[in-house]
Amino acid sequence: MTVSENSVLETEVLVGGSAMPNERPGAMEPQSLTEMPEGFPRRSTVANGVRSRSSRRFFVVGGALLLSSFAIYEMGAVFSIGGITPLEYLVLLLFAINFCWIALAFCSGIAGFLILLRKPKAKDLEVTELHTRTAILMPTYNESPDRVFSAVSVMAEALSQTGHGHAFDWFILSDTTDPEIALLEEQAFLVLRQETHKHSRVYYRRRRKNVARKAGNVADFCRRWGSRYDHLLVLDADSLMESSTITGLAQRMQADPDAGLIQTIPSLINGTTLMARLQQFAARIYGPVIGTGLGWWVQKEGNFWGHNAIIRTEAFMGAAGLPNLKGKPPFGGHILSHDFVEAALIRRAGWSVVIAYDLPGSYEECPPSIVDLAVRDRRWCQGNLQHSRILPTKGLHWVSRLHLLTGIMAYLSSPFWLLLILTGLMLALQAHFIRPEYFTDQFSLFPTWPIMDSDRALRLFYITMGVLFGPKIFGVLLLLKDGQFARSVGGRIKAIFSVLFEVVLSALIAPIMMFIHCGAVMSILMGRDSGWSPQRRDDGSMPWLTLIYRHRWHMLAGVMLGYAAILDSLTLLAWMSPALIGLWFAVPISAWTGSVKIGEVFKRAGILATPEERSPAAICLQAQDARAAYQAHISKPWTLAQLLKDPALMELHLAMVDKQPLRAAGTPIEPVEAIVHVKVHEAQCQESAMALFNRQEMALVLANPLMLRSLQKLPEQFVAEDLVSFC
């Protein structure tokens, strides 16, 4: 169904009813981290409904510990021949930390590989009528409205055709602070309502103040409307989900009364730059190995990744209210990486948290460039390091603590790897420049030689590389074994070439990301907050001068490390060159990988192709077409001046403004709100008032009916006659 601009503007009432349903308030109290809440954990409804098999943990975690113990012993043996020096002890410690980290991923990969060898199918549930109600939430923050609303449009239409559409309501929960985007969202919502009101219930709400970011956005919905629904299916602004996946999640939740959260493993789609396509390919070829293995061994103690998951409302509201951490950001204040914590709290309360690794049809997008990845990772890094305050929480399952620790290590591993490189380099320089003390103060007939077991060291290097690249190797083996899978990415030969290209390019990018993560950790330790910047999702290109500024320290670090290596020998420089080349050429690598044009060249060549790119799902194609249509519908943004001039348009806008009560008289007032009140009160006309507003103030005015009514009472323009009469 198409909607012309005129038909939208001529509509004087909101098609499909109010922008939001009637509120049904419910409690969602912040949970204590120091005490176990009374009544937790709940008694399971089904016998063993939240019990996991310990044998799977023994295989993966026990295997990782055994493998790590062997590697650490071997590393100690490398140094022990000539006696271990303090610097060698430091190398051994750093090696132990880093190896344990990769060993867990390797053993998870083995489990995933063995499961995927059998080509498991999604668990078939008896198709029954859904008697539960699910709210599908799409939080958005300064995103392109055409992307968000077109995605909801196609998903809602597809879901309505399954016969289960009556069991779902759709909510676009906006935290947008850009006034122009906010008005575009309203235009897009009118189009969406015109398209869907006959078969779906779709709602829209923009918060006046985005307290606690995305977690606060969802919590606000829960406290005001959550009690109307049995489940919450949380999406992200770039999410897509097939109707069969949506209904499958709801049916699984309905069939398992002890399920608190079911997380899907999204596939990456719509990558246009080389960097995005690199991530898509890696996630598609190697990701299922890790994801399947993880879901297999964590069982009922899974994790939440913030979106593309269904949550039982009772479990979420009753157990996952987030407290504010003591102190100021970056370690205090609102919990940024809320998803891991919410999953841990839901499991603590006695509900199961499951990763549905067998359920396809879940999609998301990825950052288009190294710089965009760095911006996102800076925020995630702060949130994950904040989890160090959550680890001691009373009553958490040990697997939940391991999830939190794994998230922390995702970023701390970079400083540890860098320290390992630096200490190894120091060992080499020490052996080259510092004369060894062959005869110590203690009497001995034999000298003390600085000896290492080179054969054992080389063998350990091969083992470490095998563990590090093991999940990639497993993914490639599965690809080569499955002829249909291989054909879906262009055939085995092209797939092998793509894998080799991915390995080389990832190796060049890895040291850049290592230094980016090191910088993020350092800035957090120095007390700097990440803020909340909207994400770029399409073009990752930037001016070269901007990239030089962004990567200046990475290039300098590469030069310094290269100089230190060449002081020892050309051989050491050659060994370090895989890491150094990426740093030396950080700027062109960042520019080329963020280019849509270069990404298109590789797409035409069939390099880094994925099944989702070569044969997109129907929902993905429909979303692309719908987005183009929405771009045309909202090509002429509304303005505040138009709202003030057109009473019908103003009524449409006010119908979409959040109905949350305004500040009561005599209560504290926000500084920005006070400033706006003064500006409106002192303005002589609408034109002069609007000229005084900045973007933050404009967004506040758009969300405040009283201020809008006050502006409406002012004349459009100030004329000279008014001044004469005033005098």
Curated annotation (Swiss-Prot):
The lineage of its organism: Bacteria, Pseudomonadati, Pseudomonadota, Gammaproteobacteria, Alteromonadales. Belongs to the glycosyltransferase 2 family. OpgH subfamily. Residues 18-45 are annotated as: Disordered. The keyword Hydrolase does not apply. It is a multi-pass membrane protein. SUPFAM superfamilies: Nucleotide-diphospho-sugar transferases. It is an enzyme of class 2 (transferase). The gene is opgH. This is Glucans biosynthesis glucosyltransferase H. Keywords: Cell inner membrane, Cell membrane, Glycosyltransferase, Membrane, Transferase, Transmembrane, Transmembrane helix. One of its GO terms (biological process) is glucan biosynthetic process. The keyword tRNA-binding does not apply. Involved in the biosynthesis of osmoregulated periplasmic glucans (OPGs). It comes from Shewanella sp. (strain W3-18-1).
